[in-house]
Amino acid sequence: RQTILYGLKGISAYGHQARELGYYSDEADDFYILALEALTDDRLSVEELIRLTMRTGEMAIEVMKKLDEANTAIYQNPAPQKVNVHLKKGPFIIVSGHDLKDLEMLLKQTEGTGIHIYTHGEMLPCHGYPGLNKYPHLAGNFGGAWQDQQKQFDNLPGCILMTTNCLMRPRDSYKDRIYSTNVVGWDGVKHIGKNENGEKDFSAIIEQALELGGYPEDQDVQEILVGFGHHATLGYADAIVDAVKSGKLRHFFLIG
């Protein structure tokens, strides 16, 4: 039952993100309700619960497909892209979480302001999407894993926008410059919601980022390569197979 519940949490998270972009799966939605009901049904046998667990996995894949369809239909298929992981001088906003639509809205509203936008954590893959990396002020990625955010956000001379997922208790050193949006939030943290048209006004975080000013000097450029989604990777399939056969490629590492 716990495994099913964990699976449903993932299904709801990815399903919500897809729905924010206008995509959803009736099959996954119907299963979600049935599975929630089954979690409280003590009449189910172990065999029935195992079958339900396997079905949960199938629906997780289904909703991931739907989210991938949404992301690629709107922002195009990811392609390899170099990303600077150090900060430039000037005002900046760091965007963390999962919601590509929030990132896009912020990029549009900060055009021409001189503000650099940096991804953080699981936003890093956004740099591979042509529909997002077309914005020149999407300047790079900041920091590492989400669990290090309290240390990495400490005393930053810029603002942070937390979209869905991975917000930890903010320290006092940056609580006045961190904002939340979508389904994430924290007591005392400024929240940016939708208007009646489904749009968001990011003027408050933009104004504060300009006031803070950012760093006075550029940091040395250090780049990493992202954008190898399944579509891009399959484009190199023949070269990968040849490298394996020749012994040039001997190890594959699964992360996540």
Where are these regions (language model features)?
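Metallocofactor- and cofactor-centric catalytic cores in central/energy metabolism, strongly enriched
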Residues: R1-G256
